[in-house]
Amino acid sequence: MRTLKALTTCAILTLVATSSLTVTADEAVNTSKATPLILEKNEGEKRLWRPIEGAKGWNAVPGPFILKVDRHNGGSSHLVFGTEDIPPGESIDRHRHPGADEILFLQNGHARVHLGDRTREVHGDATVFIPANTWIEVTNLGTEPISFVFVFSAPGFENFMRAESTPEGQKITPLTKAEDAQIQKEHGHAVIYAEP
C-alpha cells in the first residue's frame, strides 16, 4: 500500500511538472537552478499555522504543515508540493486559487469534499483535481487526522502559507483579524476565501 501511495504521488508530481512546461530537445538538459531532492515523509520546511484571534475550530489552533518543494526548497519555479493534516471534525475553509490548478491526494481517512457545485464523500487514497478558480472545501468526517498531499501547478500559495505561519520550533504569535485580512489582501492572486 505504501508503495502504491509513493508511486501515485510520484505520478502526480510528474504529471503536474511536465504539464506546465514545454521543452524542446535542446532544452532537455536541466539548466535551471533547481536541485533534485529525495525527502522522507517528515522532511521539508516544517511550519505551524498561526491561530487567528477570536477564531474557532481549526483557525484557533496552530496546525502543522510541510512545504517540500518550491522556490525555497529545491528551487522549483514551476510547482509547489507539500503535506498537511486536517484534525477530526475540522475543515479547510471554502476557497479558490485564481492562478494555479491544485491536486489533493488524501492518503487516509474519510472526508466530504465540496468542489465547485459538486459534493462527494471520499476515503483514503482519493485524488481531487481542482482547476484554477474552482471553489473547494474539505471536511474531515472521521475520528483520526486526515493526511494529504497538495500540489500546485504554479507558485504563489506557498507565500501566503509562510505569511500565516511560523517555522516549527519558533514562538507562535496569534494573528489579529486585521493582520489576517491584510495577508489575504496581499496574496489575493494566490488564494481567495469565501466570506464566512
Pin down the residues of each PLM region.
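A short, N-terminal "cap"/entry segment at the start of jelly-roll beta-barrel domains
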Residues: V23-L79, T166-P196
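Short acidic-glycine-tyrosine-enriched beta hairpin
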Residues: D117-N133
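Bacterial N-terminal signal peptides
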Residues: C10-S19
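Ligand-binding loop in jelly-roll beta-barrel domains
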Residues: G75-S76, R112, A132-E158
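Bacterial N-terminal signal peptides that target proteins for export
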Residues: M1-C10
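Conserved short histidine dyad/triad with adjacent acidic residue
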Residues: F65-D70, G82-H97
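Glycine- and acidic-residue-biased ligand/ion/polar-headgroup-sensing regions
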Residues: G99-D101, F105-A111, G116
